[in-house]
Structure formats: C-alpha cells, structure tokens
Curated annotation (Swiss-Prot):
Intervals of motif YXXL motif: 709-712
Annotated protein name in UniProt: Envelope glycoprotein gp160
Taxonomy, superkingdom: Viruses
Chain spans, region Immunosuppression: 571-589
Gene that encodes it: env
InterPro entries hit by this protein: Gp120_core_sf, Gp160, GP41-like, HIV1_Gp120
Length: 853
C-alpha cells in the first residue's frame, strides 16, 4: 500500500524537484554585485582654481626691478611632463576661460604694486608756459631724410614753478614734454598748457629702476588639479578637441601690453588661424594667429638726456633736459613683402568665413590714441605708431590687390608718450621717465586684432576689417586658448562581484542617516548619542579648518601692502591651502568609508540596477572612467551616503560584538584577575561594617557615660528599673514586666548589619535634626541681634548727626561773632588813624603857637 502511494505521488515530486532546480539556476544567473571604491581613477571635472606662477627670473637682470615681479615665482621645471590622453575628447572654450580673467587681474595687480612706492606727480599739475622746441636739420648727416624729421611743435619746452625741498619756497624749472602729453588751457594764446591727465587721473611716476621688459610667465595649477592642453594644430578656440594632453604649467607667456598687433607670442604650427566668438557679430574681436612671424624694428634716434628735479621733500621728478644731435621722429620698419604675404594668407582664411566677398583693410575708425595707433613699450618708452600703411589694401575675389605700393620697407611714423592712460582702470595714469640715449628694439608680430565693420552683409560685396584692441584680455586669450583647468576626482565607485566581510547583526529601526546634527549639536548629549554623529562632526571640522584658512588668506590679502607680499606670494599661499584641502577631503571620505590607505576597497553596499543596468563585464570592458562617471553622476552623492551609513553600522556592530565577547565564556568568570577583584570588594565591605560597628560602639559609650551609666557589654540585656512605685520582685512573682530600654541580643551577620544600618539612620536623623534646630536657633538669634544692632546704629547715627548739626551751628555762630568783633576793632583802628592824620595840622599849629609864645 505504501509503495503504491509513493508511485502515485512520484509525478508531483518530480515536478517539484524540476521547479526547485530552475529557481536555483535563475538565482545563480542573477548574481549580486557590490559597490567597490577605487582611489586614483582618471576622472576630472571642469573647475576654477587659483593659479600660481613659475619663471626663469634668474636668467634676467637682477638689479632692475621687473614690473612682473617674476622674482617671486617658483623656478620652472627643467623637465616638464606632458602626458598625452589617448581616446579622449574634451570641450574647450577660449572665450569663457577663467584663466584669462585671472591673468588679467594678476597683471593689473602687478602694475599697481609696482607703482605703489613711486612718486605722485600732483605738484606738476600747474600751469606750464610752453614754446615749440627749435628743430634744425643737420645737413651734414647723410642718414637724415625728410620723412624722419619731427613736425614742428612735436616737442614743447615748458617752464613752470614747483615747490622745492623747503615747502614754503618755490622756484622756476623747465622740462621738455611731448605734444601728446600736454593740452592747452582754454582762452589762452597756445602758450599756457597743463599735463593731459591732471583733470581726470592721479599721475604716478614709474620708479626709475622699474623695467617693463616682458619676461615669460608660466601659469601652474596646484596639487589636486590639472591643466588640459589641446594639441589640435587648427583648433579654432571653442568646441571639441580630440588631441588632448595634461600638463602642470603653461608655456612661457610674455605679458606684452600692446594694441592692434600681437608681439612676441606663439605661432600657429600649420596655417594661419583666425578665431572669434561669433564671426557674424561685428562687435566681436577677431584674433589672428600667424604661422610665420613678421619682424618689426623700432628706433628712437634722438639721444635724450634727463635731469632730476626736486618737487618736494623726498620726491623727485625725472624730466627730459635736452636732445643731442638730430631731432628725428621715432619710427618702425617692416618688410613690405612679408607683410603683404601675411595679409594674403589672412584674406584666404577670412574668405572661408565670408564667402565671395572682397576683403578690405582700413585704418582705425577713431578713438583713444591707444586704439587708433599701435601702442607698445620699446626699451622703456611707450611708442604710438600710425599703422595706416599696414591696413590700406583691398583684396578682390580674383586674388588681386589694390594697395599702396612703394619700396621694400614700410616705415611707420611713431610718437612717444610719457603720460600713459593705464589700461587697467579709469582714473589712473602713469608717467614714464625719459630714457637716456638712443632706443632700438626688435619684436616679432605673431598676431593681429581685427574688428569688422557693421552693416547688412547681403547688401555689400566688401567686408572691411580694421585694427582693434584695447581689451588686454584678448592679448592673454591669444596665448591661453589651448588650456583649461580641471579638478581631479580620484575617488570612483563601480560595481564588482566582491563583497566586504562584515559582522552581521540585526538592523535597528532608526538608521544613522536620520541624525544630522551640527558639529557642536551633540555636545550636551550622552556619549552614546554623540558617537552617532562622529562622521558629521569630522566633515564639519574639516570644513571649519578650510574656512579658517580662507579667512587667513583674506586677511593677508587685506594687509599685503604691510607685509610686502606680491600677487604671486598670495597665490602660492592659496595654492598650498587648496592642495591641503583637496588631500584632506579625499582622505576624510576614504576614512569615513573604512578605506584608509587602500586603493581598491570592497564594501557591503549592494549595487542597485536603477543606478546603471549595464553588466559588470560591459562596464569594465567597454567604458572609460570618464564615461562611467557621467553615467552615474546623478547618483554619486546618494551612493556616498549609503557607504557612510554602511560603515557606521559596521562599526556599531563590531562594538556590540566586542561587548558580548566579554561574557561569551563562563570560564572568564573564574579568571584570577576577576577573583582578585571579588576579594578586594569583599574586604572593603567587611572593613566598612567593622568600622561602622566601632563608630557606633564609641558613640554608645559616650552616650551612656553622659547619662551616668558604666560602659557594659554591647549585647547584654539589662533590666530597667521599675520606678519608685514598683519595687523589684522575684522571678516567681506573677505579673507583667516593664519594657527594657536596651536593645535585643541579636546573632548573625545580617541581623548585625540591619541593626547597625538602623542605628546609623537613626543617628543621622537625630544628628541632622539637632543640627537643623541649632541652625534655626542661631539664625533666629542672629536675626534678633542683628535687628537690635541695626536699631542701635540708627539711633546712634541720628544722635551724632544731631550733635554734628548743633556743633556746626555753634561754630558758625562763634565765627560770625568773632568776625563781627574783629571788624569793629579794625574800624575803630582805622577811625583813630584817620583822626590822627586829620589832627596833624592842628597839632603842628598848636606846637608853633606854643613855640612863638
């Protein structure tokens, strides 16, 4: 019968086994993955940070103070490392690059700092009596030419009155000024002038030893950041770049301050490259980068001499005294063939943006001298050159050109200004002291700044381009177009099949994530409650440290004029703090997750497919770290929070397990150290009871002696007297005995302990009650005595105040009487003296009468 039942149920049993096997196979196929932390992954994000400088300052003259303060920069790396990032495409945008703004602010600060200790020329804002300097052509010099002669009135010989080293004394002095540096005063006959910027700016004279020679500056990123460089040879400045490398510093950038023409910059590696934020917007500047430089040689033939004028105590003004030799105009020379070839290549590139158009170059449409002319610094003097000959040509579609032809050399007439409107900000001007001797300099034109005339491009077939400039950001942008700063994110999370071995305990109802207190919010909590917020406190403590460092840096920046710190010094401090902040933040996160000192750290947090449903093999075999970070970017903070909760729960579990391990084995109860502790506790209890018995025995003896009894045995039961009306009887007598006054005779440890404890409580009660009564009595007595003393002192005060009043009245009366009596006596004496004087003639007459008689 049993065999038949087994055969009957075999079909159901076989189906159940098959279903169980399928479930096991499905569960095995759907393997679980866990979050794994990786430290040092190649991941970055766009960021802005403080850059610091590196320079080969030692390779230049150390006696001359360079305005760029490159002596405060760190030395350049002799072997710079550049790592090419293969299979990486990164977006660059030269028009929205924080590096450009940062360099612009740095150059402004460096100019301001270099002029801080220099002399203010406010005393020179006086009336100048000027005449034209006589210009005579030296015919014996064969090199002189008509074009080179300076125009009449280009140099003014001005006399003026200035304060000497003694403030209340004034003397007359003279100096030579350029026509561009002075303006005539209204309603005069062109003989009275003033300095050009006196009505709008504060003029500061550049210190005599300040040099404006551009020294290459390398911008570097602090630790924790990287600089990406685009190596595409035809990169237009914005958009994706496929040839990317990472560097720590830029190439050497010369901070050349110039307009219209870019000097001594970097060249394009292949064809000429033109860059603009928007070619269809004529308000946007077009930056042209040449692939071959054009040499420009500039000369100031005049041999100037200068003199030192005292304009007050401790202040000196350096003026031009005289011009020796030919007074010829400063000029620059450019090869016409090279310049035309350069323009032809520029036209080819412009036609790619403006198809079927005639390209015309024309001179500047007007504005400040810095914009209208090509301004730059040559040997310490600021040249302003007329570039009309450079930009005066038309290039038609067929390739022909209509321009000014001439000899092989293009000569640009230049003027020199000594009072320069500072390009950094309005309201500041600088006076460049004259340079003695002749000046020559040679520069390389590596780029142009162009602007396009407006208008509807469909109505005209000609696009007119003019030289531009003035915004020095375009100068820096022409060098920094290939760089961008990124923040390295070395911590990455990804799913793996490995799980961290953990201590398994039942989860509590309240999670750690529900407790978010401030850094000091748990100060009043219990130790157990405060330990829950240790992670939050660690994070807030780090942000507090960083905030403190930032506050210190702001304080240093506010006092840099007292500490004599340059801009580069501030940036180096900031770079070091940023590096420390980055390192501490990463190490803090790794420590919070229990991964300190590890590069690969497994966790017990399961991977959720909602974060990314890609398989582990697909992730690790087909994706880069940058692609993976973009995939899970929205869930990174949530994963970090889960890792923190998991590690906190793990630490709690380990703590509770360690607490249970102390009682895991009963054998620990019989450990010799525990027994010694038990014995010590027993001895302390017994000793305390014995001491208590001794104290009560002494107190009982003292109490009995005070009552007239002899100190008998502590436990002997003594009968009490019956009183005078009840005589003692015998044991055989009947009747009830009176109660005894002594305590009962007890046996045993617990009974003795109870009696002693009861007696102690009664003793303390009576003692405290008596003490309270005594204190109450003392307070009452002191209150009564105090009130009586107060009344006594009050009566005494009233008595003595009345006595003092009476004494004062008596004293005043006596004084008045004495004064009155004294006054009467004085009056009588005066009267007697007057009578005596009045009676003198009478006495004389009487004496004469007696003598005659």
């Amino acid at each position: 019968m049993r065999v038949k039942e087994i055969r009957k149920n075999w079909q159901h049993l076989r189906g159940g086994i098959l279903l169980l096997g399928m479930l096991m196979i499905c569960s095995a196929a759907k393997e679980k993955t866990w979050v794994t932390i990786y430290y040092g992954v190649p991941v970055w994000r766009e960021a802005t940070t403080t850059l610091f400088c590196a320079s080969d300052a030692k390779a230049y003259d150390t006696e001359v103070h360079n305005v760029w303060a490159t002596h405060a920069c760190v030395p350049t790396d002799p072997n710079p490392q550049e790592v090419v990032l293969g299979n990486v495409t990164e977006n660059f945008n030269m028009w929205k690059n924080n590096m450009v703004d940062q360099m612009h602010e740095d150059i402004i600060s460096l100019w301001d700092e270099s002029l801080k200790p220099c002399v203010k020329l406010t005393p020179l804002c006086v009336t100048l009596n000027c005449t034209n300097l006589n210009i005579t052509k030296n015919t014996t010099n064969p090199t002189s030419s008509s074009w080179g002669m300076m125009e009449k009135g280009e140099i003014k010989n001005c006399s003026f009155y200035i304060t000497t080293s003694i403030r209340n004394k004034v003397k007359k002095e003279y100096a030579l000024f350029n026509r561009l540096d002075v303006v005539p005063i209204e309603n005069t006959n062109n003989t009275k002038y003033r300095l050009i910027s006196c009505n709008t700016s504060v003029i500061t004279q550049a210190c005599p030893k300040v040099s404006f020679q551009p020294i290459p500056i390398h911008y570097c990123v602090p630790a924790g950041f990287a600089m990406l460089k685009c190596n595409n040879k035809t990169f237009n400045g914005s958009g994706p770049c496929t040839n990317v490398s990472t560097v720590q510093c830029t190439h050497g950038i010369r901070p050349v301050v110039s307009t219209q023409l870019l000097l001594n910059g970097s060249l394009a590696e292949e064809d000429i490259v033109i860059r603009s934020e928007n070619f269809t917007d004529n308000a946007k500047t077009i930056i042209v980068q040449l692939n071959e430089s054009v040499v420009i040689n500039c000369t100031r033939p005049n041999n100037n001499t200068r003199r030192r004028l005292s304009i007050g105590p401790g202040r000196a003004f350096y003026a031009r005294r005289n011009i020796i030799g030919d007074i010829r105009q400063a000029h620059c020379n450019i090869s016409r063939a090279k310049w035309n070839n350069t323009l032809q290549q520029i036209v080819i590139k412009l036609r790619e943006k403006f198809r079927n158009k005639t390209i015309a170059f024309n001179q500047s449409s007007g504005g400040d001298p810095e914009i209208v002319m090509h301004s730059f610094n040559c040997g310490g003097e600021f040249f302003y050159c007329n570039t009309a000959q450079l930009f005066n040509s038309t290039w038609n579609v067929t390739g022909g050109t209509n321009g000014t032809e001439g000899n092989d050399i293009i000569t640009l007439q230049c003027r020199i200004k000594q009072i320069i409107n500072m390009w950094q900000k309005v309201g500041k001007a600088m006076y460049a002291p004259p340079i003695t001797g002749q000046i020559r300099c040679s520069s390389n034109i590596t780029g142009l700044l162009l602007t396009r005339d407006g208008g509807n491009s469909t109505e005209t077939e000609t696009e007119i381009f003019r030289p531009g400039g003035g915004d020095m950001r375009d100068n820096w942008r022409s060098e920094l177009y290939k760089y961008k700063v990124v923040r390295i994110e070395p911590i990455g999370v990804a799913p793996t099949r490995a799980k961290r071995r953990t201590v398994q305990r039942e989860k509590r109802a309240v999670g750690i994530g529900a407790v978010f207190l401030g850094f000091l919010g748990a100060a009043g909590s219990t130790m157990g409650a405060a330990s829950v917020t240790l992670t939050v406190q660690a994070r807030l403590l780090l942000s507090g440290i960083v905030q403190q460092q930032n506050n210190l840096l702001r304080a240093i920046e506010a006092q840099q004029h007292m500490l004599q710190l340059t801009v580069w010094g501030i940036k180096q401090l900031q770079a070091r703090v940023l590096a420390l902040e980055r390192y501490l933040r990463d190490q803090q996160l790794m420590g919070i997750w229990g991964c300190s000192g590890k590069l690969i750290c497994t966790t017990s947090v399961p991977w959720n497919v909602s974060w990314s449903n890609k398989s582990v093999d697909d992730i690790w075999n087909n994706m880069t770290w940058m692609e993976w970070e973009r995939e899970i970017d929205n869930y990174t903070d949530y994963i970090y929070d889960l890792l923190e909760k998991s590690q906190t729960q793990q630490e709690k579990n380990e703590k509770e397990l360690l607490e249970l391990d102390k009682w895991a084995s009963l054998w620990n109860w019989f450990d010799i150290t525990n027994w010694l502790w038990y014995i010590r506790l027993f001895i302390m209890i017994v000793g305390g009871l014995i001491g208590l018995r001794i104290v009560f025995a002494v107190l009982s003896i003292v109490n009995r002696v005070r009552q007239g009894y002899s100190p008998l045995s502590f436990q002997t039961l003594l009968p009490a007297s019956r009183g005078p009306d009840r005589p003692e009887g015998t044991e055989e007598e009947g009747g009830e005995r009176d109660r005894d006054r002594s305590g009962p005779l007890v046996n045993g440890f617990l009974a003795l302990f109870w009696v002693d404890l009861r007696n102690l409580c009664l003793f303390l009660y009576h003692l405290l009650r008596n003490l309270l009564l005594i204190v109450t009595r003392i307070v009452e007595l002191l209150g009564r005595r105090g009130w009586e003393a107060l009344k006594y002192w009050w009566n005494l005060l009233q008595y003595w105040s009345q006595e003092l009043k009476n004494s004062a009245v008596s004293l005043l009366n006596a004084t008045a009487i004495a004064v009155a009596e004294g006054t009467d006596r004085v009056i009588k004496i005066v009267q007697r003296a007057c009578r005596a004087i009045r009676n003198i003639p009478t006495r004389i007459r009487q004496g004469l009468e007696r003598a005659l008689l």
